[in-house]
Amino acid sequence: MAATALDHLSLGGKIQWLAQLNTEFQPAREFRRTSIICTIGPKTNSVEAINKLRDAGLNVVRMNFSHGSYEYHQSVIDNARQAEKVHPGRPIAIALDTKGPEIRTGNTKNDEDIPISAGTILNITTDEKYKDECTIEHMYVDYVNITKVIAPGRIIYVDDGVLAFEVLEIVDDKTIKVKARNNGYISSRKGVNLPNTDVDLPALSEKDKADLRFGVKNKVDMVFASFIRRGQDIKDIREVLGEDGKQIQIIAKIENRQGLNNFAEILAETDGVMVARGDLGIEIPAAEVFAAQKKIIAMCNIAGKPVICATQMLESMIKNPRPTRAEISDVGNAVTDGADCVMLSGETAKGAYPTEAVREMSEAVLKAENTIPYVSHFEELCSLAKRPVSIVESCAMASVRASLDLNAAAILVLSTSGESARLISKYRPVCPIIMITRNDSASRYAHLYRGVYPFLFPESKPDFSKVNWQEDVDRRIKWGLSHGIGLKVLNEGETVVVVQGWKGGMGNTNTFRIVKADVNHLGLGQP
């Protein structure tokens, strides 16, 4: 197994590369390219807990708006922002995951888990009096039209398919008689799926719109948009976010057959994609999710848009201190498929071992990243790029090629919006991408891009009528090199490819040069 660009260049295609793997290989310097998203729940909603997760590998904090009050979510945002201050310049991104057009059960009394046995007959109801009083006889769901779209013989799944109910009879306009097909528990606020059923829910509910406005007010960095079914859904979300939320990245969650069928138009509109395997694995046969994951990730890689793999990645660690071998392989396969980020849900929101789960995921990601044949991957992505490419993308491709030929330790990019960093990330260099920006929002959402280490430059933009443009550029480069060395992403004296614009502002990246990292004076001469 190789660590440097020269090692990668010495081997041929994927099969030859994999045949050379050394399972005991330890690179001289490890850096993780794939970001880790952690859902924050009551067990981890504190500055101390978030910093523990961060030290273990957290990059993005996720808030699930299917649960919790605005007061609770405000506390998550406040705690994440406070935790970020412990390491100034190292941003923590904040993601708002919408409820979307989903269906959920009501609450059980005192949030208890009610055991249920296979063969049990009960009523699924939309009667509001059971909303906070679900029992073994009556389980509330929040979709008022469920009796109109379901039919006897159909299956209703609850809690990512953990519970399955066969529809026996439509009793009245509020009640469905069902039979449990397996043992399990009736719990509070669990997701409900109706496979092979046309659900007439709007893409954005009034709650979703209010939640998005809350996100804009609190300057969240990204929105994970649930149950996206068509490209127009993304446009509708952008309209709600408005001018004040124009920098918020929209990540389309693909969770049903309609989203899969319309994926090309969704990809054209969205900033990124999440393979939300929980609901997807119920809405389509579970065996198809494997292929769907690979297809979605590949299409995102070709488009250069970030993609997240989520759901049940280390599910057993909700209760157990160590993951299963299958879970570690699942994480590794997501990485080798090409995911930019991997996500933890219940593992960090309510699990008994949240920090350990992040640490295990980080270790699994690192090992998987070392198995990827980066050079052949780069060549294939270059061949698939639609010509003519933009000037910025051409510069990104050239900088990655230079990093391979030079065996560079890093690519350092000065970016306003993060676009140039995204395009460099698209071509998957062997080395890390150090992104320096003055854009507070971009410094956070750049965690979506594989291999990017974003840093917020602390100095405000100068008046270029008084300050030389190139002097400001050099100052940012020196600062970035210094931080790279300080975080051990770089070693003193190593070669770095620097990517920059010829003037300030977005879309002007067209130049790269080669420098040496020197911790003493950080000179910018040619190596």
Swiss-Prot record:
The keyword Transferase applies. Its EC number is 2.7.1.40. It catalyses: pyruvate + ATP = phosphoenolpyruvate + ADP + H(+). One of its GO terms (cellular component) is cytoplasm. InterPro entries: Pyr_Knase, Pyrv/PenolPyrv_kinase-like_dom, Pyrv_kinase-like_dom_sf, Pyrv_Knase-like_insert_dom_sf, Pyrv_Knase_AS, Pyrv_Knase_brl, Pyrv_Knase_C, Pyrv_Knase_C_sf. This is Pyruvate kinase. Keywords: ATP-binding, Glycolysis, Kinase, Magnesium, Metal-binding, Nucleotide-binding, Potassium, Pyruvate, Transferase. GO terms for biological process: glycolytic process. The record marks 253 as: Transition state stabilizer. Substrate binds at residues 62, 278-279, 311. K(+) binds at residues 64, 66, 97-98. It comes from Neurospora crassa (strain ATCC 24698 / 74-OR23-1A / CBS 708.71 / DSM 1257 / FGSC 987).
